[in-house]
Amino acid sequence: MASQVNALLLPVIESTPLHQITKVALTTTLTSKQSDYKFKEIAVPLTKSLQLYEKAQRRQDLRASLKALESIIYQTHFQWNNPLPRHAHLFQKHYHFLLTHWPFENHRDLVDSIAVNNGKLNSTSSRSVWLKADWITLFNVKNPWVQTPPSLMRLSGTDLDTFTPERIFLINSLGNHYKFLIANSHLSYNHKKYPSPGVQIPIRNALGEVSPAKQIAQLFARQLSHIYKSLFIENPPLSPENELALTAVFYDETVERRLRRLYMRACARAYTTTNADSTTEPLMFHCTRWEVD
């Protein structure tokens, strides 16, 4: 199937006004050996964008044509051909640890604490708490609702709750990543505002009861899915390799001003890590700016 689709897509890619660096990245990604699922993840949205581009060209709709090309540029260099940062791989590796230690706020306990706190509601759900707090401290409490699967229990020599150096690196890198995107809201996908990342466990009824444990466990799973999507799919940091590739595009003297501006718009949300090779110090992030005419 992949070879048949590529036979249709590759000539269309070559006919676009995109820079050769983007065309090569697209071609390499499409023709590399991968599962049908991974291929479809790229081929389906790419086909839609190319169809939009061709239709816009026939209608002589310049705005729609440029929008389609912007989408292809962003997806190529930021998503399809962009290696995940180290803490994304660790997120997957230590998923169960995050699931059982992800910070939460139980609304039942919150209500019960009002009397103790002189009628004050001491909530930890505000973004300011997450922006100022030491994230390791926030992760110290293990939640009682997520059960450890038997398959993990049987793993010999594995301490599921230990704050290993790798897990500390992961948590602090996630904290830096979240704080960076909050501080640079212009980078967010569709101008999305990031709420507090803690799990909220609501009161289910007037009696003050909360949901069954299984449903609460699902809240944690959904929140981790949302966090991963926000940090690594919708707003992924640009890899150092891709930053260099795009820099080559911007400083290519043969590129026309209109094409350079197209790339500038497509890459307006670019940011990258300042210490991508670090294995001990948590990752830090900075906005990428290309000073071009």
From Swiss-Prot:
GO terms for cellular component: mitochondrion. The keyword Cell wall biogenesis/degradation does not apply. Keywords: Mitochondrion. InterPro entries: Gep5. It is found in: Mitochondrion. Belongs to the GEP5 family. Essential for respiratory growth and required for maintenance of mtDNA. Required for cell survival in the absence of prohibitins. This is Genetic interactor of prohibitin 5, mitochondrial. GO terms for biological process: mitochondrial genome maintenance. Pfam families: GEP5.
